[in-house]
Amino acid sequence: MLQPKRTKFRKTHKGRNRGLANSGNEVSFGTFGLKATSRGQLTARQIEAARRAMTRHVKRQGKIWIRVFPDKPITEKPLEVRMGKGKGNVEYWVCPIQPGKVLYEMDGVPEALAREAFALAAAKLSVQTTFVIKTVM
């Protein structure tokens, strides 16, 4: 699963996820893309599950790009532990998602197949998405 090899700090503040995606909001590598239309956070497990669903559906033809990376650690305290006594341990990694962010891209497959694959992937994700096609200038 995806996670940083090393980080400057082990744990981060919770933070806020506001605004729209101002980078990574266009299809730049492939021809088709899966773009987020709602805000939320994707875990490393969700990103990997969606990637597997797409890869298996297109039977490993074409190319798939993952445009998001989980670089924010989420901590949890063990069950039945009283409040206080410091911040919990890092349990998993997430990627904060803003509306407009392109999550995945695909190339080398027909549009109908790409739509089906992205629909399977979207079912694995916790944000609402839409299918987009690269615009040619």
Swiss-Prot record:
GO terms for molecular function: rRNA binding; structural constituent of ribosome; tRNA binding. Pfam families: Ribosomal_L16 (PF00252). Signal peptide: none annotated. The keyword rRNA-binding applies. Keywords: Ribonucleoprotein, Ribosomal protein, RNA-binding, rRNA-binding, tRNA-binding. GO terms for biological process: translation. GO terms for cellular component: cytosolic large ribosomal subunit. It comes from the Bacteria. Residues 1-17 have a biased composition (Basic residues). InterPro entries: Ribosomal_uL16 (IPR047873), Ribosomal_uL16_bact-type (IPR000114), Ribosomal_uL16_CS (IPR020798), Ribosomal_uL16_dom (IPR016180), Ribosomal_uL16_sf (IPR036920). Residues 1-24 are annotated as: Disordered. Disulfide bonds: none annotated. Part of the 50S ribosomal subunit. Belongs to the universal ribosomal protein uL16 family. This is Large ribosomal subunit protein uL16. It comes from Aeromonas hydrophila subsp. hydrophila (strain ATCC 7966 / DSM 30187 / BCRC 13018 / CCUG 14551 / JCM 1027 / KCTC 2358 / NCIMB 9240 / NCTC 8049). The gene is rplP.
